């Protein structure tokens, strides 16, 4: 099983060919990926897919645009068994709407929505989403649970400092079950 969390960083590609080289390399790698994770920028910059109607200021979430992008990606790469992304609408630097979607076996699964999530530190939210998603699949082999674990874990990580989540499984389950997305200490 090959899992790829697409994080495109222009500064890392600048001296070795820029965007064109990044797309060339990432398109080759994508042929071997089973689970592709990434946001709109990651899919567009790394693989060259366009998200029609996407708001590059992240002031609104266009779920249908992300679904169309993922459908395009899985057609181009039929080896993808799962494609997933977080959905973030930036309200302020410290307040975001947060959720996630996942494609698996031709169907979409959406997480609970976390409106006006209080952000302490955005760093690590995507990685925590990816780890929660993997846990949900490994533990339950259930796409809906996977996207819920991922979104809740990412939300919790965003409410704490640093890029390493200290949330427990119980806290993640409480969060996607309707509890607050704040780590209780």
Model-derived regions, located:
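Conserved small/polar residues in nucleotide/adenosyl-binding loops
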Residues: 1-3
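Active-site beta-loop-alpha junctions enriched in small/polar residues
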Residues: 7-11, 41, 88
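Residues that scaffold the ATP/ADP-binding catalytic core of kinase and kinase-like folds
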Residues: 12, 46, 175
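Charged helix-capping and loop-helix junction motifs
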Residues: 17-25
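Structural alpha-helical scaffold elements that stabilize or flank donor/cofactor-binding regions
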Residues: 28-29, 76
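A short beta-strand/loop micro-motif in the catalytic core of glycosyltransferases
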Residues: 33-39
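A short, active-site helix/loop in glycosyltransferases that binds the activated sugar's phosphate group
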Residues: 39-49
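Conserved phosphate-binding/catalytic region of the ribokinase-like
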Residues: 49-185
